[in-house]
Amino acid sequence: MNTLYWLVTITDRHSTDALLALYEEHGITVSLRTVGAGTAVRETLSTLGLEKTEKAVLFAMITAETWPGLQKDLRRKMRIDVPGTGIAFIIPVSSIGGKRALQFLTEHQTFALKEESTLKDTRYELLLVIANQGHTGSIMDAARAAGAGGGTVIHAKGTGMEGAEKFLGVSLASEKELV
């Protein structure tokens, strides 16, 4: 199977460690995490007896083979399908810049590398770059030179970076920027 997905999980911050442990059970050892804030209006929260909370936002690369089992466990163990507990969704990935980066991001997951022979015909594409802090300017310079009108920077902390030297030959700082 040659399909990769960018997994996004948003839930309460107190669930972060449990989610990372669940990811690890499914061979997802590399992820990025950051915080967000819920936007529900005060009246809705009050009606439901809830308080405004900070959210954990986790990003990871997963394979098509990994997703069904993870999705099942997100529902069964994390109760992600219960309203108010969070959301998990996947975005198809069409390419990754470099074989070593691909191996690192899919470590411990089954993935058969295969070169795509045809490009997907899409009107828009989402380009994500994960970089050490401080490189956003050069990334955006390159993106603008290629026609991008702008971008968004998300500050995150990398997890599972211990194995980075094995694949990339360099140590990675845990503080990241997702552009």
Language-model features: where?
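Positively charged, small/polar-rich N-terminal and surface patches that mediate targeting and assembly
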Residues: 1-179
